[in-house]
From Swiss-Prot:
It comes from Notamacropus eugenii. AMP binds at residues 215-216, 220, 239, 313, 344. The gene is PGK1. The modification N6-(2-hydroxyisobutyryl)lysine is found at residues 97, 216, 220, 323. Pathway: Carbohydrate degradation; glycolysis; pyruvate from D-glyceraldehyde 3-phosphate: step 2/5. This is Phosphoglycerate kinase 1.
């Protein structure tokens, strides 16, 4: 799947056209109030571009939460997003109480020029995901004929399809792959994601470093495997590190995370690294805790001493951080997926925070730094480094699947140029 060869919004003639745009407005809410509008703001450049370039209308569609195909307007309505959009754009936004059907089709057929229309939550229909739950909570599958009708109805709402929802690009949902229009382009947010990942995966700057953290080796086997074909160096930290250290060094790890499934493949991964000439850096010292708790008693341990019974490693120690700095300083391109400690708790955040500072410094001297979504993106938000690295991905699952070498359905369906 070539990421850099997709039709982009700026290459489409929009004059007089109705644009139907898949966005990611899956924003956090409390009592129907939006607590973080970042995802809405991220879609504004694409929306404004359409309006500035003569589009007749922009119809926006998104999911919110997991209603599983059951309409839950009290809990998961996108109506509060319409109000937020209106204040951000300074323009009226028409909110429709459904996303398909005759009334919606009529409202979108010939709207006044320059209209902005927001549809209700796509996931109120089981046909969006293809599966869901009935009113009693039993799992159900969508009927193929109804899915076709759902997709056909969405397709009537625009003349041009634009996808700007990278966060959902790994899902083959109706709004991602089922809108059947001649022109299917990526919006500016999607374009930025694809540009950075194409650079990382197809033509990386070297030396290329991957920093991989997180808990389970089994969850990251495909990621490690694929990246071993791409990188020059790899740091493996976080909870995953303990599985590697126990298998390779027979280290005592106390009650630290150990992944039985992942342990079986550690030696194969190391053999592949050696064959490909990839240098792997593992932690050598640890901040320990007597229980998995923010206020646990803390201690120190090293690779040589091991972690005592009843204790667990929740962060890397200063010697590991020093090793990581050396590797980061050498790199010309970095992809980082997964924290190297329990960064949510102050006592165990130092390792990840120090690594973040080093990645920021690397960016200043011209290194291309790409932060995979999910927890690592949360770290950037927590320490205000989002604009101090080259790119923070908006899609945790989508960026992970790209780095694993998978094809993203929401991208492959877009027109090639």
């Amino acid at each position: 799947m070539s990421l850099s060869k997709k039709l982009t919004l700026d290459k489409v003639d929009l004059k007089g056209k109705r644009v139907i745009m898949r966005v990611d407005f899956n924003v956090p809410m409390k009592n129907k109030e939006i607590t973080n509008n970042q995802r809405i703001k991220a879609a504004l450049p694409s929306i404004n571009y359409c309006l500035d370039n003569g589009a007749k209308s922009v119809v926006l569609m998104s999911h919110l939460g997991r209603p599983d195909g059951v309409p839950m307007p009290d809990k998961y309505s996108l109506e509060p997003v319409a109000a937020e959009l209106k204040s951000l754009l300074g323009k009226d936004v028409l909110f429709l109480k459904d996303c398909v059907g005759p009334e919606v089709e009529q409202a979108c057929a010939n709207p006044p020029n320059g209209s902005i229309i927001l549809l209700e939550n796509l996931r109120f229909h089981v046909e969006e995901e293809g599966k869901g739950k009935d009113a009693s909570g039993n799992k159900i599958k969508a009927e193929p004929a109804k899915m076709e009708a759902f997709q056909a109805s969405l397709s009537k709402l625009g003349d041009v399809y634009v996808n700007d929802a990278f966060g959902t690009a790994h899902r083959a949902h109706s709004s991602m792959v089922g809108v059947n229009l001649p022109q299917k382009a990526c919006g500016f947010l999607m374009k930025k994601e694809l540009t950075y990942f194409a650079k990382a995966l197809d033509s990386p700057e070297r030396p290329f470093l991957a920093i991989l953290g997180g808990a389970k080796v089994a969850d990251k086997i495909q990621l490690i495997n694929n990246m071993l074909d791409k990188v020059n160096e790899m740091i493996i930290g976080g909870g995953m590190g303990f599985t590697f250290l126990k298998v390779l060094n027979n280290m005592e790890i106390g009650t630290s995370l150990f992944d039985e499934e992942g342990a079986k493949i550690v030696k194969d991964l190391m053999a592949k690294a050696e064959k490909n000439g990839v240098k792997i850096t593992l932690p050598v010292d640890f901040v320990t805790a007597d229980k998995f708790d923010e206020n646990a008693k803390t201690g120190q341990a090293t690779l040589a001493s091991g972690i005592p019974a009843g204790w667990m490693g929740l962060d890397c120690g200063p010697k590991s951080s020093k090793k990581y700095v050396e590797v980061v300083t050498w790199a010309k391109q970095i992809v980082w997926n997964g924290p190297v400690g329990v960064f949510e708790w102050e006592e165990f955040a130092r390792g990840t925070k120090e690594l973040m500072n080093n990645v920021v410094e690397a960016t200043k001297r011209g290194c291309i730094t790409i932060i995979g979504g999910g927890d690592t993106a949360t770290c950037c938000a927590k320490w205000n480094t989002e604009d101090k690295v080259s790119h923070v991905s908006t899609g945790g699952g989508a960026s992970l699947e790209l780095l694993e070498g998978k094809v993203l359905p929401g991208v492959s369906t877009l027109n090639n140029v």
